[in-house]
Amino acid sequence: MMSAKTLTEKILSRASGKDVSPGDVIEAKVDLVAFHDLTGYHVIEVMEKANMIKVFDKSKLVIAFDHLAPPPDVRSAEIQGYIRKFVKSEGIPNFYDINYGILHEVMIEQYANPGQVILAADSHTTTSGAVGAFAQGMGASDIAAALITGKTWLVVPQPFKVVLEGKPAKWITGKDVALKLLGDFKADYFNGMTLEIFVKDPLSFPMDYRATVSNMGIEMNADALMFIPDQETKRYIKEMRGYEPELVTPDNGAKYVDEYTIQLDEMEPLVAAPHSVDNVKVVNELEGTPVDQVYIGSCTNGRLSDFEIAAKIMKGKKVKSRCIAIPASYRMFKEALERGYIQTLVDAGCIVTYGTCGPCLGGHFGIAGPGENIVSTSSRNFKGRMGSNEAKVYLSGPAVAAISALEGKITDPRVI
């Protein structure tokens, strides 16, 4: 009789065609492969050097331009042109040029499904774990190999169980849950593990929040971070794509290396102070810190609920700090526009544009200067991440970011 399996074991058993356990080295079939402009150039280059320009299944490759969108310099334009030639010559159907948005948002909106194995040439591939996919970022050589063969090798991770109980307290979102895990366990604790997150009240913790937590799974050094598929997963995929997915869930009695419970109704707004994602503090510990610029967006927090929160806080007011707001995709931008959130942010003095990674990686569209303090809803705050090595980046959820932009200093949103 087969033992009860975790979600990780179920997915990787199916993908490898055999019964697997943590620690096993396996060859797994891949359901989806993806890359963006910054990494895609290297993936194609690896394939060219090996004289193996072929894709195992063109319908299973997704390409999106986001890091260099729109191209901030001539070299970026050349890179995008190189990838466009590949798309045209190979007849790749799932291609998103500079006018759509961030790769990871494209994946959860349109492609990722429960139980899939997804690889992409970017560390934040873990975002697709929000719908219950085993999603992992890899380097150019591994992605090229997966594109050619449709397979990859993996070490089956140890599964760690997280339970979310209760309803989120006021202004608490997925970012606070991610920061709590980072603060409580530190950034290297989950190396070699998969986090499997169970939500006791599924509709109280929506997909936007789950995507944020999954996105930051890589900051926890986890191999993958997956939410157990439930009625919220069904609701989201049906709303976005028009069909109900088949749910893959763990067996009752499945064994985990450990279990941790978070009481959502007892949480406080959290901030990761410079220069580490696990330097986590309650927001009131940092209250009054001057803020030069606020960034609301990225593949971490660029979804509709993030802009709803920001607009609710900013409505009828004016920002004191520079504020850049970037929805993660065309769809998120359009819906935020239709609901009036974009208008509210523009009226408050924010700069708003469509989906690009620009400021998050210190590439363009709002680079941090020396000595500046930045409050950002993005995923990383190490030195130099958003620009100057002398800038300080504070990571927060949308509520802390929005109220801090209005006040010109780090502020607890619970004052509202």
UniProtKB/Swiss-Prot annotation:
Free-text comment on the cofactor: Binds 1 [4Fe-4S] cluster per subunit.
EC number: 4.2.1.33
CDD domains for the chain: IPMI
Matching InterPro entries: Acnase/IPM_dHydase_lsu_aba_1/3 (IPR015931), Acoase/IPM_deHydtase_lsu_aba (IPR001030), Aconitase_4Fe-4S_BS (IPR018136), Aconitase_4Fe-4S_dom (IPR036008), HAcnase/IPMdehydase_lsu_prok (IPR011826), Homoacnase/IPMdehydase_lsu (IPR006251), IPM_dehydratase_rel_enz (IPR050067), IPMI_cat (IPR033941)
Annotated [4Fe-4S] cluster binding sites: C299, C357, C360
UniProt family annotation: Belongs to the aconitase/IPM isomerase family. LeuC type 2 subfamily.
Record text on subunit structure and interactions: Heterodimer of LeuC and LeuD.
Protein name, per record: 3-isopropylmalate dehydratase large subunit
Source organism: Saccharolobus solfataricus (strain ATCC 35092 / DSM 1617 / JCM 11322 / P2)
Lineage of the species this protein comes from: Archaea, Thermoproteota, Thermoprotei, Sulfolobales, Sulfolobaceae
